[in-house]
Amino acid sequence: CIEENRILKRIAHHCIERTDGLFITLPQDSLDYQQQFIAACRQADINAEAIDPQLALRLEPAANPALIGAVRVPDGTVDPFRLTAANMLDAREHGAQILTYHQVVGLLRSGDRVTGVRVYDHQNQRRYELHASVVVNAAGIWGQQIAEYADLRIRMFPAKGALLILGHRINNMVINRCRKPADADILVPGDTISLIGTTSTHIDYDQIDNMLVTPQEVDILIREGALLAPTLAQTRILRAYAGVRPLVASDDDPSGRNVSRGIV
């Protein structure tokens, strides 16, 4: 993550706000984990510094005043809309053709070699073929379906995640819970709003296009998020989102929390 962090800050700095971040330990958490966290950060060449809780509250007044420990890290927030648009514009300037509202419905093959794709244009309601010397499967959770067109089997682990967009910006630093990954353990500032996330629930693969945020998920996000920043409990919610993480299955992890986020 820190490698990608540094690359994005270099090539897409106009899409990133350098906020820094805090990993806070609450009374119900173990300070032993803080030491493990700092050691792991140093091993990964991440500058992580334990700071006094009172200093943490001066740096980020929205943080829970009951915190008993804090670690400062070089975090930042990405504007995903601006970054996506910038990525598309840069690709087009380098000769790419961008086809929106197009769905891959098959692969063109010559023996064992993939030579292109069959697509369906939803706007013009037509099917046609695109030929290429290299085809990259970057379809996220739908990558399993694309792979099956080539008679390959990749067992995905659909991990649904829900998050809430708050009505205004309540924090200026990214606030994380310093514990093993769990629901609602990160509060992210972004432009004029803050975002609390996320949950992680395994769903059946045939449900990946049927995303709804449940009342139970909203309750969890508000309840746990208020432990990061108490003012969250009184803050208006603008929107609720749900998506599916494109993880590759791991037999020993029913939640998907520990499944690698690396590229397969």
What is the meaning of each model-derived region?
Residues E4, L8, L83, N87, ...:
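Alpha-helical packing segments of well-folded alpha/beta enzyme cores
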Residues A63-L67, L108-G116, I170-N171, V259:
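A short, glycine/Asx- and small/polar-enriched loop/turn
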